[in-house]
């Protein structure tokens, strides 16, 4: 058999089937497009469902692909086995109603055994078939020439996922030889059994039946072929290595981790698990981010976060205690570049996302692990189970994935009370749902509304005033003929200029009435049957149904809403231009006073980025772009480059808001006629709403001017406060005052040092001999963490051969610092001293072997912590 690189196997596979008349289907993104049934693309056939179910017709009925895929149903096994992966490539050839069993089997045999392709030894190949698949048996036995002893009948060789296409399958196995086990049926040492000797390299599925609702099977009119060959597994066979992780797909990653950890792979089993976890997970994370996913607290983003945190946790067994996963991205990109160039193209962005996420997790990991260790100790002393409420707190407060808690607990033979955990999760979801609903004042989805079928036409795109008829009236949840002054009512108009809250845009306000009554409209939502449902308070007169009324939208508020909505589109485009195409809308609120825009991005924007975005939006406003709005088929809209919001559902006909060339979006909202009407755009804040999501709030027009006016007034007050007359003098004056403050602070520090020195007396008298070490462990009086470091420097200069441990009460906080002479760090480490000491004062810390720092929130425990650390050194 040929020894081939993984990239060579992939290319040979594609070339072989192209020669056999197959069309190459490019690998689709891991994030499914137009398929809500999948979290990730998880197989080679997943992207071809459009052909198998008849929605689309391929250019050729024969298809070949190499599809990247993610499966996360057994993450806990990754690292502990030879071939479990979360990210993998599936090579596949498919026939949509064209060839069937005969050709599929002959193609597979030729590719595997021909010297032009894989060159496998025929005598090392075995196959399994379904017991009743006599046709497959005949082809293997009579046509291929495989002797009966190498054709194994297995009942499980039938591909069936319930209702829909199904059929028998045949699997091809490669015999790796006696070194991987002696033949023994009692130990499943046979093709199809659980063993390391006979490896499945290819699965051919013959989709020839339809699984009916009544659990009967009928022949399909068009029979299909669906095959799958795992590239990682085939590479391990071709390269003659024991596991997939020793192939050229993983070893360059593992080699880099060896350098970082200063440890070798295949020396220590515990370390090997960590190497494999890291190598697997970084591939998944890099590819998923390249395809548009970002770490988050739910959905596919949560999967990424879980994988990254699992890898970080395992890296600690290799003594890697700092962010490093991001450094592996370039290696992944280089390995995969021949077929997947997008990872290299987006490498800088991927690294920034991963590094940001690593840093965030490292901040809470030590504290989370300390809490988990306490929970484990508590469980061991009671019922060997972690309380679900405690596990939820660990997840909710410290960002600890519940799966990580379960995994670490299982290693100690401790279970987690998942029923209580899920109950806590449900309560959290309920609270979130109720919070959302409480912000929506009109949630009356009663039978009354469902039974109202009166048509209502929205005319608000064309006008803000309209003469119409009040057709339906609701009071206290009931349809009524009339209502009285002061009552809050819901009503429907035959035609309405009032926009109903939708797409982030708030509803219009205004009045509805005639000479006999007036209703102040306070809210408008969509009724179950599509009408605009108005809410309002009767100002005067008796309201009766079927009355002719004047419906008038508050024009000033409407104009401000239009400005903010159009500015939101410009903001979205500017963010993509400045930050990158990964930016997608994650939510918005368009009001008359302001706009709020949530978007996907891995970290806080810099001030320069904020300034660039603000400038670009204003430039497009000042250009005076005509805003063209038209309805068209959705395919036509996409062809012209219209941006569809991720996760939104659109009909066949869509409304396109065109501010070309800068912004083209699908949108049902109300906009200005020309961007110049917006006047001015000013960002007032940029913040985070959750991992991977940022929020910008901004003003336009008059609100932006008033905001700038307020800033100017505050600046004038500062000018008066620092007693200067010119605007240009303010900065220099503040610098002068800061310099004076700095000098005064230095004088204060010097006085504090002198006081501390007087109180401490001769530090030689404070030093103790403990277990062969000279140790100074004491509390010092300082005013901040900087001063405790300066005090440490003073003590070190006088006692260079002593271990020095200082603690200070800073009010509600504790500051800790420790140093160890470098020549003693092979016996005791400063980082270990602080890690053991900090929890006693309610905190955490760490650092280098020769110097470490920490802190806490329980100054009353300082004396106890100092006594503890002396005992700790005594026991070394």
From Swiss-Prot:
Cofactor note: Binds 1 zinc ion per subunit.
Entry's EC annotation: 6.1.1.7
CC cofactor: Zn(2+)
Signal peptide range: none
Catalytic reaction list: tRNA(Ala) + L-alanine + ATP = L-alanyl-tRNA(Ala) + AMP + diphosphate
Gene Ontology BP, a term: alanyl-tRNA aminoacylation
GO molecular function: alanine-tRNA ligase activity; aminoacyl-tRNA deacylase activity; ATP binding; catalytic activity, acting on a protein; transferase activity; tRNA binding; zinc ion binding
Enzyme's top EC category: ligase
Subcellular location: Cytoplasm
Binding site for Zn(2+): 565, 569, 667, 671
Top-rank lineage group of the source organism: Bacteria
Keywords on record: Aminoacyl-tRNA synthetase, ATP-binding, Cytoplasm, Ligase, Metal-binding, Nucleotide-binding, Protein biosynthesis, RNA-binding, tRNA-binding, Zinc
PROSITE patterns for the chain: AA_TRNA_LIGASE_II_ALA
Domain writeup: Consists of three domains; the N-terminal catalytic domain, the editing domain and the C-terminal C-Ala domain. The editing domain removes incorrectly charged amino acids, while the C-Ala domain, along with tRNA(Ala), serves as a bridge to cooperatively bring together the editing and aminoacylation centers thus stimulating deacylation of misacylated tRNAs.
The family this protein is said to belong to: Belongs to the class-II aminoacyl-tRNA synthetase family.
Function, in words: Catalyzes the attachment of alanine to tRNA(Ala) in a two-step reaction: alanine is first activated by ATP to form Ala-AMP and then transferred to the acceptor end of tRNA(Ala). Also edits incorrectly charged Ser-tRNA(Ala) and Gly-tRNA(Ala) via its editing domain.
Name assigned to this protein: Alanine--tRNA ligase
Source organism: Staphylococcus haemolyticus (strain JCSC1435)
